[in-house]
Amino acid sequence: MAFFSIFKQGQIYLNTWPQEAKLGIIFPENRIMKATSFAQKFMPFVAVFAILWQQIYAKNDLMAFSIAILTALFALLIPFQGLYWLGKRANSPLENQSAVWFYDICERLKQQNEPLPFVQEKPTYQHLAEVLRKAQSKFERAFWQEI
C-alpha cells in the first residue's frame, strides 16, 4: 500500500466509523477519531499562531524563529499521525471475537435484504465500519444496547 493512500484510507475510515458511545467502550477508534478531527480543525491555527507570536515578540531572534518553525511543523503533523493510525487500522484484519460479531451483524442485515460489503478473505476494520454504519441506519437504538 502506497504511503499516501494510507492517509486517504484513514480519512475514509474516519468518515465511515459510527460515533456510538457503546463502540467507544470496545474499540479505541472513537477516541482516536475525536482527537484526529480536533487536530485537523485546530492545529493549522496553532501553527500560524506559533509563527505570528514569534514574529511579534522576538522578530530578530533566529533561535526563536527556528523553535517557532519546529512548533508549527509539529502542530501540522499531529493530524497526519491520527490519519496514519486510522489508515493502518482500517486495513487490519479483525480479531476473532470481532469477526464473529461482524458476521452476526451481517446475518441480521441479510435478513432485512440489505446489501453488504464484499469480503474476500478475512474482514477488516473498514468492513466492520461499513457494516456498523448500515446497522446504525437500519436498526433501532435497542440494537446498540444488545452489543
UniProtKB/Swiss-Prot annotation:
Location relative to the cell: Cell inner membrane
InterPro entries: UPF0208 (IPR007334)
Keywords linked to the UniProt accession: Cell inner membrane, Cell membrane, Membrane, Transmembrane, Transmembrane helix
Keyword Transmembrane: yes
Transmembrane segments: 38-58, 67-87
Recorded superkingdom: Bacteria
Matching NCBIfam families: PRK01816.1 (NF002493)
Family: Belongs to the UPF0208 family.
Signal peptide bounds: none
GO cellular component: plasma membrane
The protein's name: UPF0208 membrane protein CGSHiEE_06015
Membrane topology: Multi-pass membrane protein
